[in-house]
From Swiss-Prot:
The keyword Glycoprotein does not apply. It is found in: Cytoplasm. It comes from the Eukaryota. GO terms for molecular function: actin filament binding; ATP binding; microfilament motor activity. Residues 105-780 form the Myosin motor domain. Keywords: Actin-binding, ATP-binding, Cytoplasm, Motor protein, Myosin, Nucleotide-binding. Residues 810-1171 are annotated as: Tail. The keyword rRNA processing does not apply. This is Myosin-B/C.
Amino acid sequence: MERKQTQMILGRRLAKDSPEVKHFQRKSSVVPFGRDGRAATNFTCWTADCPAVKADPTLVFAKCIVVGGSMDTQLELEQVDPPARGTFTVAPTDVFNANELIEPETVDDIGYLPHTNVACVLDVLKSRFLRSIIYTTAEPLLVAINPFKDLGNTTDAWISTYRNASKPEMLPPHVFKTARAALEDLEGYKKNQSIIVSGESGAGKTEATKQIMRFFASASSEVRTTIQDTIMAGNPILEAFGNAKTIRNNNSSRFGRFMMLDVSSHRGIQHGSISNFLLEKVRVVSQEANERSYHIFYQLLKGATSEMRAKYHLRSLKEYAYLNGKNGGCYDVPGIDDKADFEEVLQSLDAMQITGSKRHSVFSILSGLLLIGNVSIEGKDAQGVPDAAYISPQSEEILEEACQLLSVDDAALKKEILVKSTKVGPQVIEGVRTKDEAKTSVLSLSKNVYDKLFDWLVRQLNSLIDAPDGMPNFIGILDIFGFEVLEVNSLEQVLINITNEYLQKHFIDVVFDMETKLYQAEGVPTEALEYTDNLALVGALCGKNDSFFALLEDACLGIRSTDEGFCGTILRRLEPSGFFLESRRDKRLKFIIRHTIADIEYTCEGMLEKNKDFLRKEVMDVMKASTDPVTKALFEGIEIEAGKIGKGTLIASRFLKNLEEMIGIVAQTEAHFIRCLKPNEEKKPLGWNGSKVLNQLFSLSILEALQLRQVGYAYRRNFSEFCSHFRWLDLGLVNSDRDRKEVAQLLLEQSGIPESSWVIGKTMVFVKPDAAKELSILQREKLMCFQPLIAVLGPMWRKVLLRKKMARVIHFLTRLESNARRHLEPDSINISPEEREALLSGMERPRNPCVVVKKRVEPERAPPTKVLSLSRARLSLSKELPRNYAASNEALDVDDTMSVDTDAFLRLKMKRSPNENYLRQTALARLKERRPSHVCMEEAYHVWRSVELLFREPLSDKRLQNICTVIRNDMDQHYGFFWQVIINRTPNFGMAATHIHGSLHVVEQEGMYRDGRQFLFHLIMYKTRKPRKEEIRLHERAAEKTYGICRKRDFSGIVRVMNSKVPPYMQKDVSYLIGMLFQRYQYTRDWTNFATCIQSYLIGRYSEPFGGAWNVVAQEGAFFLSRLWTKHSRFLRVEIDFPALAEQASSEPCPGCPTPVLTVVCFEACAPDRP
């Protein structure tokens, strides 16, 4: 099966038999049918052949469910994530299993997922990434996703946590965990270790390497750390001279690096050695659009003092040809301060003891290279050559200035650039070079001088950090590209990809060794392990005879070799190996290599010249004759015969020699792997491009790692997990008290699966893939037998839940009916006919509606003369509310400028109210009605009198806010500080379960908006105090107990923050706690204890010396159309979807009804300033 999403993977169409298609050609484990052919509806799966992926290919896959009408030849699917209407048909071979009831944040190792197909891997990585969990394990790999922001997870405190943990295996994945594992293995087994960090440009390899070194360097401050400081100081130098801004990464490493460190857990980094390879030399002389050359050039030109500028003949950035690419130069980079970085480089040079004359030589060489690029070489007719090279007088001055900086003879260098010497017998015949030959010579000089300068800096660093007597044991860190696939691939990509093939072979050996040790530890036979490595491919690429490298070297040593002839030779000699194919686009100059991860097309155009890119002996002799010690030392020990190319001097040959030496070292170590992923090209935090990540899963062999774990007994779980996974095979057996190992064995024996397909180990069950699939089929058949029973029990259970719900809310419904009767008294409010017609028709209301309110007479609570039935009230509301909702909202804040004058209110309050007796009777009646009131009679009367005075006039939202302020200040002055006021306009607040630490009073009050609409609102007032010291200690212990229930889960995706006036870290922390406790109390609905736990945690963890008590209000329902106002400095309101309410809700809710949620409000009562 050739899947659609793989046809353009990695930028080209796949052959049907390409290696990477095996990840998609695996038989789908989706088994939505029983043996009788019945489809299992609501079965979850992934597919790429769906509307969402067609609209947005970056999604790659969408989650769907199987619906009725599915057959064994095609599945009827409904898309659920992202949601879409309608159904569509897909072939069963075009779907993947989905992992159900799996919380991605709890899955540290994706290898232990029930399904590890590519869709499930993408889903888990995406879910964790969006929750800022960037590290995931795919043993033996650590997958690290670049977050493009600081998550605060690499601080010294994090290092301390991972260094000092007594059980590091219980910690979540992290580069620090990998570094600690390498360090413990080094000291425990006395065996050399290596950490291989790979990924594409911008994936975070450099940052991961720096964090590993920080972990190793975090030793006791009492130990001398001179060498360690030197190694750490070398990082800015290597970055300045080896990193550059590319289109894909602002700080891209353009070289490979292998560091060997002598590390101790107590003394830090003691010695080290650094090897560099594959420096991108061409970047010195040219860059693509929106890219830069190496950072050091820009740092020098921006950060140099006026004295340095004069000393090194520095010009502006725009005046250098080498720094202005094809479409102009790119001088500035967001997030990079070249001046500040130059100061850091100077400090690092001091630490590396590159001072005085050495530092002068380095800067002189850099300036000289830039000036040589400004030398203009022209062509003219001379000595019978129509395009003979010559240098204009103006450029000769520039060349002379550059040679002065390089401390070489300008006349000798000019001659070697322009004059060609040919030795014929004893005579030397001189002739002119062409314009192109001279330009090539200058470019080659610039590239090689910079390359040798970089090598010299590495040697200087090594001379300071090398162990005098060698390192007995070391940890190696390899920082290198993953497989690289570009639009046009040439020699550079061949070298990078061959390196990765060597590393892939080593990786396969490591996985095989790891699996073998696991089988032996569990007592499982290892005969089932059958691995296929890439040894034959490595031989076809790098073998001594009839290999790519051998043919490349022969072609470069040949006299009349051409790129086209070299391409033909490759196909003629190597195509029989099965790893080299003809290109479908250009058979003359292109060929395809069948790499481990994909078929990659290369071009031979210019490949021979690139391989021969070396400095001619004559030019090298000029550089060796330099009077500057550093310039002279750049080419020491390099001998080339004049006019000839010798074996071992070619780029590929030298690279292969260094590569084999490095791989030989790595092969002798115990390897740890870190794969860095780049989630998007725009470098946006939380940006996810599924197709880009999928490419990297292939290029970094992450899917290959998971595929290798499917060999042999691919399904392996401990006994408890196995029994839980397949419990429906025999529920009674699983629920018994028998030993889990015995239960697991009985389940397998009863299934009828051949014993050759499974093994019971010491602590785990090992099952082959086909047998695991058969178990899934059997379990699904068992579950399908329950469908008729579920169809009967489902409605019965919903009926029971509905009755329980009604029993809990019947009291509130009675109160609601009473309030409805009171508000629906006939003739209590008269609205003009024009206004009523506008409200009913949904038209715009008049700006000044004529509203006549009859004054309500309050006798001794006389019963109303006529009461509308509750059914009529509901019918009226259900018709009018949805129709007038939008229009009514416009009148909420008719007069935002209306305010309440506190002083005027207090003066008015001193007067005796005409309804004084009524207010006292009302307060007394409320206290006797079992209202949630715990204030004294005097306070209750005070509250009701204040409310009655303030609500005499029509209201607006602005006025409600001011009323809160006035009531709070009034209560503070009369009854002490720490009073809080909350106003909510919805009747749902009558159903609220509140927990307040202090005196509480709830007021129901009628109000009328300025447009004539009446409403019922609730006002909660309560008085609290600062907690005492002994209470805070009790709360601290309660907070630790509360927070320690479940530390590893993350509820940031469940808990929605609606309003917040707390720091982000506190918002995340408290949201997590609320989500965790909600999982515990959602079925009991004991919101008082729920609120108590939250309050204890807040007081114990976040109370400040001058703050008050934290208060918590929990309410079933949203604060819909409400104005919640409190006077405090720290405040958090969240909403949580309430599945229990959702299940009990009607299938056809009334229009305008909110989604069932639980609202939690947390705020701190702070003492206001005294007037």
